[in-house]
Amino acid sequence: MPKKPIIIGVTGGSGGGKTSVSRAILSNFPDEKIAMIEHDSYYKDQSHLTFEERVSTNYDHPFAFDTDLMIEHINELIAGRPVDIPIYDYTQHTRSNKTYRQEPQDVFIVEGILVLEDKRLRDLMDIKLFVDTDDDIRIIRRIKRDMEERGRSLDSIIDQYNSVVKPMYHQFIEPTKRYADVVIPEGVSNTVAIDLINTKVASILEESKKA
């Protein structure tokens, strides 16, 4: 039976630096079998809806995610079996018809705004991190990312932030902070916190290799 991989959950508000923190951990272990799985990949398929309906979907609500499939995939990876992870198309606001093959690893970083919201997912994690970043910084980062990478207009980003992103953060995301083992203020720029986390991960990996 394969050894259980280390599962690290990384969450926080949109634009808060979750991905940067995750990449900082990934880059610290270049010689290890380590990979990141994004909750965003598991947004539900909306191909049955019109484009206008897809645009108006609340993507910051737990119902927007197929977390059941994500949990199923992580359990498969824990068991040592590869999975085919969906690829989400942000320009069309639905899943594409493509997937990518994820092989079993020694460490998985599970990243997303709501990865600590579901107890079943939390229970699979060995380390749970919450990236805590000021609201003003998050909205600036979100505007830059969505305009450059996702083809969004400034007006649509601001409207979505005020009507959906901000209220959903306070209703669903911020409350999951209580489940975190470590809260990281200011994200990846908090080098002390990142170093401590990397030291902990290295320690767990070393113990796992001895077992």
UniProtKB/Swiss-Prot annotation:
Q: Name one Pfam family in it.
A: PRK
| Keywords tagged on the record | ATP-binding, Cytoplasm, Kinase, Nucleotide-binding, Transferase
Q: Fetch the NCBIfam families from UniProt.
A: PRK05480.1 (NF004018), udk (TIGR00235)
Q: Name one GO cellular component term.
A: cytoplasm
Q: Where in the cell is it found?
A: Cytoplasm
Q: What class of enzyme is it?
A: transferase
Which HAMAP family did the record assign? Uridine_kinase (MF_00551)
**Which InterPro entries does the entry link to?**
P-loop_NTPase, PRK/URK, Uridine_kinase, Uridine_kinase-like
Q: In which pathway does it act?
A: Pyrimidine metabolism; CTP biosynthesis via salvage pathway; CTP from cytidine: step 1/3; Pyrimidine metabolism; UMP biosynthesis via salvage pathway; UMP from uridine: step 1/1
Where the protein is mainly located, per its record?
cytoplasm
Reactions that this protein is recorded to catalyse: uridine + ATP = UMP + ADP + H(+); cytidine + ATP = CMP + ADP + H(+)
GO MF terms listed in the record are: ATP binding; cytidine kinase activity; uridine kinase activity
Q: Gene encoding this polypeptide? A: udk
Record EC number: 2.7.1.48
> Which positions are annotated as binding ATP?
12-19
Q: Which family does it belong to?
A: Belongs to the uridine kinase family.
* GO BP field: CTP salvage; UMP salvage
Q: What is this protein called?
A: Uridine kinase
Organism (species)? Streptococcus thermophilus (strain ATCC BAA-250 / LMG 18311)
